[in-house]
Amino acid sequence: MTKQPGIFRSGNKYKTNMTSLEFLEYSKTHERVVHDASYYKPKRDENGDPVKHYNGSATAVKGLRVCFQTLLEHTDSRFTGRLMKIATEIYRRDSEGEHCKKSVYFSRSKGFLGTIQFNVRVIFIDILAHLFEWIHVEDRSEATLVLNDFNIKPCLIPRGATHYRILHHLSIISDFVFSEYHQCYMPVDKLSGMNAIVYSEYTPVGIALTEAVKVSFPSGTVLSEDDSVIESVGVEFTMKSAGKFLELGGCGVMVVDVY
């Protein structure tokens, strides 16, 4: 591996591993980058003004994180990076938008949203996917998770868990477009980011659960064609101690439908 010349920080001091000649060349280049306007020539429009670059993917990812704000504790450290890949791919697929001002049409790429993974290290939830049944009303404001004799195999139950419960989550993500007036990316619908979550009753491990877990948005919520609803389910294990339920790590959450 070659030695890269440069300046590095050691404690509260800055040191260099370059020779005096290398440092002189480095200083000249650094001064040119900082002070010489001709060193970097940004793209300019017809009027000669620099063309601004806007990142619609980053704004869209922030919108997705707002949707999952009640589920972030069940995600891993690379969750945001995976969201960025999805948003960037959707951003690139906009063939109608202007360069650097393309839109992020989630409503046209719902299949990508269905691939969201909250925690790649927790895979037991995928094994239980066939035990879930879900339905939603036509206006997409309410969904029901149906559990018939839902039972978890002992090999999937973490050590120390005495009870479990099911979570049912809905969230709304709107398309993001560039606003010429505000000079930034904004959601098409103000409902973007709205979410609702409902839990089932605590059930002792080893006991089959039969229940309908219904979750809905506030009354009067009307969704538009620019909105997409992400439906997620999860299993949360707890340990009962002194009459209180203590959550154990490793809660599994997965996206089951996008409509």
Predicted region positions:
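Short acidic/polar inter-strand loop motif in beta-rich domains
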Residues: 237-249
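Proprotein-processing/basic-patch segments
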Residues: 250-259
